[in-house]
Amino acid sequence: MSQVERDHATLQAGKVVYTAKTHTSGGRENGASRSSDGRLDVQLSLPGAVRIGTNPEQLFAAGWSACFESAIGVAARKRRIALPADPAIDAEVDLHLADGGYFLSARLNVSLPGLARDVAQALLDEADQICPYSKASRGNIDVAIKLV
């Protein structure tokens, strides 16, 4: 069985712990997205448009950085390392157009002030293996995760 087949089998056997549900209409140019529980209710617009709204790249950056910071916490607890009170992640997601197609790239710039650099880097490396967004993007888009 290949690694892909093993991963798929694990996913099929895994317990669903949460399902996010949203309804989107109008697309990225003049749309809106709302979650089924009402906690997310956003207008969508193109970057730089007159209309106020967010876009899929901003939502992806926010989701990934929040998830990655939580994964750092999981890694820290596993290693019994106290995290600083003010960890932060600046996420950048680029939308590219090349050869008639769109694709993404991303950078996560992680700040863990007060931790030794080698300890912080070990946490980032482990978090990258834990975070579902990192797993989903691995091998699909160019990603740089950097300790700043």
Role assignments for model-derived ranges:
Residues 1-62, 69-148:
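Extended beta-strand/beta-hairpin segments
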